[in-house]
């Protein structure tokens, strides 16, 4: 694992080429078909060197939860192990890693009809009134969720209306943890400025590769919008807004790079609190040797 632009893919490919391993992607952007440039999806040459499982498995119009990922990843792990190989899980979506390793609470799946009901109530009464409802049924979640956070507020109310139990009650029970021994590594530059520079350089390369054209094609479909999880991925939202005329090109670049740096900051915050983590420095010689030594 590691922040965006830290060199995870390069190290994983080296590992897959030199050892009996197969790669499983742990990335909430790489799951989407047609989102190749802005997600930094491995190139055709890279995929030929080391095929990645769990990429291009959803249309951008579809949702994909941490629970979906956990089920899919466990199935892939079991298949790889049955082939006598070692699974290598690579990515930066920390919520997916956490769900896989620790298990998940048995929350109900989304119900579009109930979500529509909640949205209609919010349109009529305001989110503050719905927050009052949540405080009555789940004071713990109400304390944690701000009235100005409609996505999380709606989900907490939805869970209660589907199950008759509060999110707090349901999250006290988790599915079983992953039944495998896992050696965990994080890779990141030692200096923050190095990572910031890498992020800016990579976004410039994405634009040269046709990132704006990719977003233009996604917009032209007509069934996608900025409220979808796929279009909330960093870079895609800013390019979309630029194409809508919300700001100029230079501002788009500035906003996209800033959003990516914020993502990297959040990823590093997760990783610094992660237990049993072995750290590698991006670009350092001997990373593969260090990694293999720790795995023995």
Swiss-Prot record:
It comes from the Bacteria. ATP binds at residues 2-9. Substrate binds at residues 4-9. Keywords: ATP-binding, Magnesium, Nucleotide-binding, Transferase, tRNA processing. It catalyses: adenosine(37) in tRNA + dimethylallyl diphosphate = N(6)-dimethylallyladenosine(37) in tRNA + diphosphate. Residues 27-30, 151-155, 232-237 are annotated as: Interaction with substrate tRNA. One of its GO terms (biological process) is tRNA modification. InterPro entries: Dimethylallyltransferase, IPT, P-loop_NTPase. Pfam families: IPPT (PF01715). Its EC number is 2.5.1.75. Its cofactor is Mg(2+). One of its GO terms (molecular function) is ATP binding. The record marks 93, 115 as: Interaction with substrate tRNA. Belongs to the IPP transferase family. Monomer. NCBIfam families: miaA. This is tRNA dimethylallyltransferase. The gene is miaA.
């Amino acid at each position: 694992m590691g922040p965006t632009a830290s060199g995870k893919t390069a190290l994983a490919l080296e590992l897959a080429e030199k050892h009996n391993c197969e790669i499983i992607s742990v990335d909430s952007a790489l799951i989407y078909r047609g989102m190749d440039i802005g997600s930094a999806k491995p190139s055709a040459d890279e995929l030929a060197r080391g095929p990645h499982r769990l990429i291009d498995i959803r249309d951008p119009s579809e949702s994909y939860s941490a629970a979906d990922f956990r089920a899919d990843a466990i199935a892939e792990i079991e298949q790889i192990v049955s082939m006598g190989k070692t699974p290598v899980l690579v990515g930066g979506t920390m919520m997916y890693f956490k769900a896989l390793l620790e298990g998940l609470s048995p929350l109900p799946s989304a119900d579009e009809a109930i979500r529509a009901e909640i949205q209609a109530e919010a349109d009529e009464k305001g989110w503050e009134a719905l927050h009052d409802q949540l405080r009555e049924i789940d004071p713990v979640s109400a304390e944690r969720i701000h009235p100005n956070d409609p996505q999380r507020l709606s989900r907490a109310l939805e869970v209660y209306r589907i199950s008759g139990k509060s999110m707090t009650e349901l999250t006290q029970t988790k599915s079983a943890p992953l039944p495998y021994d896992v050696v965990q590594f994080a890779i990141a530059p030692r200096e923050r400025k190095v990572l910031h520079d890498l992020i800016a350089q990579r976004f410039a390369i994405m634009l040269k590769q046709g990132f704006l054209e990719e977003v233009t094609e996604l917009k032209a479909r007509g069934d996608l919008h900025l409220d979808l999880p796929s279009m909330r991925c960093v870079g895609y939202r800013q390019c979309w807004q630029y194409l809508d005329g919300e700001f100029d090109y230079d501002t788009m670049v500035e906003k996209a790079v800033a959003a990516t740096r914020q993502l990297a900051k959040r990823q590093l915050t997760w990783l610094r609190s992660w237990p049993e983590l072995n750290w590698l420095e991006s670009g350092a010689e001997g990373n593969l040797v260090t990694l293999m030594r720790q795995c023995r």
